[in-house]
Curated annotation (Swiss-Prot):
ATP binds at G9, I10, P11, G12, V13, G14, K15, S16, T17. This is Adenylate kinase. Belongs to the archaeal adenylate kinase family. It catalyses: AMP + ATP = 2 ADP. GO terms for molecular function: adenylate kinase activity; ATP binding. It comes from Pyrococcus horikoshii (strain ATCC 700860 / DSM 12428 / JCM 9974 / NBRC 100139 / OT-3). HAMAP family: Adenylate_kinase_AdkA. Its main location: cytoplasm. It is found in: Cytoplasm. The lineage of its organism: Archaea, Methanobacteriati, Methanobacteriota, Thermococci, Thermococcales. It comes from the Archaea.
Length: 196
């Protein structure tokens, strides 16, 4: 039976670090897939874009088609090995927040778990300010908290349409990284019996 874990968190929460460390420790051999990368590869193949930043400017129906194609590929891959899908639950745009995974995509992916990585707004803000290599929007602590709240709401919506379990993992500055990695490993290890 396919085993798909969606992992999400706003920029600066430490999702990439936790994911990388957990994949090194889990007993299951997950395939890590970035949903946006898969969409971008398809768009390049179809000569729709040359750069990733152009993806946001594609017509909505084209973006939806790219999402559907990516979801179908992932569902097919999940028949052979467990998938850890790195994606955004919500995407902040100049006009508001966009759901990262529309209903049709969630139905195809049918995840087992939706994992949200969180930290306090002050921790996230501090990490963003220390990571000057990344081009990130400047947000207040209130805006960061709002984005995390919207991610929780999106995860509930996704779970309603897939029967996935939601797991919130906190990544705090004071020894939180190790605990966060261990919590994710426990979830990933559940896939071992599915692919034995």
């Amino acid at each position: 039976m396919p085993f798909v874990v969606i992992i999400t968190g706003i920029p600066g929460v430490g999702k990439s670090t936790i994911t990388k460390l957990a994949l090194q420790r889990t007993r299951a051999k997950f395939k890590l897939i970035n949903f946006g990368d898969l969409m971008f590869e398809e768009a390049l193949k179809l000569k729709l874009v040359k750069h990733r930043d152009e993806m946001r400017k594609l017509p909505l129906e084209v973006q939806r088609e790219l999402q559907m194609n990516a979801a179908k590929k992932i569902a097919e891959m999940a028949k052979n090995y467990p998938i850890l899908l790195d994606t955004h639950a919500t995407i902040k745009t100049p006009h508001g927040y966009l759901l990262g995974l529309p209903y049709e995509v969630i139905k195809i992916l049918n995840p087992n778990f939706i994992v949200i990585i969180e930290a306090t707004p002050s921790e996230i803000l501090g990490r963003r300010l220390r990571d000057l290599k990344r081009d990130r929007d400047v947000e207040t602590e209130e805006q960061i908290q709002r984005h995390q709240d919207l991610n929780r709401a999106a995860a509930i919506t996704y779970a309603m349409h897939s029967n996935a379990l939601i797991k919130i993992i906190e990544n705090h500055e004071d020894k939180g990284l190790e605990e966060a990695v261990n919590e994710l490993v426990k979830i990933l290890d559940l896939a071992v019996k599915e692919y034995a």
